[in-house]
Amino acid sequence: MALYEMNLSVILFLIGILGFVLNRKNIILMLISIEVMLLAVTLLVLVSSYSFDDILGQTYSIYIIAIAGAESAIGLGILVAYYRLRGNISLRQ
């Protein structure tokens, strides 16, 4: 049963990598792709924790989600400062 969830996690991670590589112009889409990759890893940690009947993986996933939230807040703060400085958020001008 856990094999389906692990495959889903790998597919989500590959979608995140693909989104990051293909959207090199838009910073917001790059941040979203990084978040998708991080949440795919979190899903893999949760599934592995459930498979091995270990609660430590669940606590790690809570930490990963908290760090992802902080990373998103910092990234969006930097993005707002970049927009105020340059007037647009495009990487290529």
Curated annotation (Swiss-Prot):
It catalyses: a ubiquinone + NADH + 5 H(+)(in) = a ubiquinol + NAD(+) + 4 H(+)(out). Pfam families: Oxidored_q2. GO terms for biological process: ATP synthesis coupled electron transport. Its main location: mitochondrion. It comes from the Eukaryota. It is a multi-pass membrane protein. Signal peptide: none annotated. The chain crosses the membrane at residues 2-22, 27-47, 62-82. Belongs to the complex I subunit 4L family. This is NADH-ubiquinone oxidoreductase chain 4L. It comes from Mycosarcoma maydis. The gene is ND4L.
